[in-house]
Amino acid sequence: MKHLTKIAFLALLLASTSCASRKKTVAPVQPQPFEWLTANMDIQAEGNGMNFDDLSGQLRMRKDSLVWLSVTATLGVEVLRAKVSTDSVWIVNRIEKTYLAEPMKNISETLGIPLSLALLQTLLLDNNEGLPPVENQTVQLKSFVWGNLSAKIKYHNIKLDEKTAFPLKITDKMERYHLKKKGY
């Protein structure tokens, strides 16, 4: 009798769980509000005949105000540092030992694309709504092809902060570097 009770219990348990079909409801993903965003990234990029497979980076962003990016290669060697504000772009290329400090308008005209801080933040945050049309443009989750530039970005250690700002010491160094090179 003991075995019959156990078998009946197991059969009842199996019958109650095996035939149930459940539809999982997935809520639509909404953009998270933030004031500051900090993220580490693994980057694969190619464009203009160059291919970079093993890059990592650190992204710091203030909504509608600033994008700061530091890209490092293997062994932690910094390859590129960039700061993009609403009206200017500063880029230090450590490999070629060059830098760029230009108004956003000049870079937009040179590239022939409507470049802006809002567009850059849209691409980095994987929010493809409102992107201006460009030939061969595709934007997908954590990767994009825009014109002749393509990149795959894998974010990890993302931190959204609504109040606290990150220290701008590294960006200040970049500006001091720019002023030193200009001879000011």
Residue map of PLM features:
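Hydrophobic/aromatic beta-strand elements that line small-molecule binding cavities or substrate pockets
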Residues: 55-60, 153-155
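An acidic-aromatic
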Residues: 67-117
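Short beta-strand segments that buttress and anchor functional surface loops
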Residues: 41-45, 69-72, 141-146
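Non-transmembrane domains of secretory- and envelope-associated proteins
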Residues: 131-184
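Bacterial signal peptide processing site
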Residues: 20-23
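A short, Trp-centered hydrophobic/proline-enriched beta-strand micro-motif
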Residues: 31-48
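Bacterial N-terminal signal peptides that target proteins for export
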Residues: 1-8
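C-terminal motif of bacterial Sec signal peptides marking the signal peptidase cleavage site
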Residues: 15-18
